[in-house]
């Protein structure tokens, strides 16, 4: 069974299928993708398909980061091995993940504006092309904390952000990020996904001394 057949079998709802096609379209322009919040594995299948679309001389790379390694992660690893895509899983908090260069970041952890800003502001100097944010409709105006009526102080401590950040929705956080990072622009918003694109290449992170 091809990866596309797997996607077709998993998602028959038009909006869900379109979300995956957006990941595949922009992801196919990438050689390395990092995903924060990989549990469930659905977006991961689209990432693998995107990297397969762009497979060339060098192995593409997919790094999945999550607090839990469930069966879906193991399935992603098996699929990646089958199609010769380098797959790495990092168990832990996204805030502790070591930064490195990549073409794209897919962000789908606990949906709070403060969490998004903390993760993305740390990672963005290393991201060459795209940032995908999932959950921007259901938790766009208010955060997952507010929507689910969770203990804001406890969540803020767990996510290492302020209580205001835990209450902030994703859309105002994205607007705040774009205002202070003018080399990024929003290029797509559909359903639960928003895509940001870097408009200016990142500065050399490893400058050569004269």
Predicted regions and their residues:
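A short alpha-helical cap/connector motif
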Residues: 1-210
């Amino acid at each position: 069974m091809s990866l596309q057949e797997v996607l077709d079998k998993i998602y028959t709802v038009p909006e869900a299928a379109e979300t995956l096609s957006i990941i595949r379209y922009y992801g196919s322009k990438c050689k390395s993708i990092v995903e924060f919040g990989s549990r469930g594995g659905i977006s991961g299948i689209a990432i693998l398909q995107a990297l397969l679309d762009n497979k060339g001389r060098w192995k593409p790379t997919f790094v999945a980061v999550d607090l839990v390694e469930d069966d879906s992660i193991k399935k992603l690893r098996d699929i990646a091995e089958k199609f010769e895509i380098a797959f790495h899983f990092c168990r832990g908090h996204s805030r502790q993940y070591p930064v490195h260069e990549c073409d794209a970041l897919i962000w789908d952890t606990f949906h709070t504006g403060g969490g998004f800003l903390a993760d993305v502001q740390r990672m963005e100097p290393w991201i060459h092309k795209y940032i995908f944010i999932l959950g921007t409709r259901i938790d766009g105006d208010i955060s997952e904390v507010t929507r689910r009526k969770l203990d804001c102080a406890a969540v803020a401590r767990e996510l290492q952000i302020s209580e205001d950040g835990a209450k902030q929705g994703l859309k105002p956080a994205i607007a705040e990020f774009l205002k202070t990072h003018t080399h990024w622009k929003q290029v797509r918003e559909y359903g639960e996904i928003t895509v940001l694109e870097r408009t200016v290449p990142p500065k050399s992170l490893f400058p050569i001394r004269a």
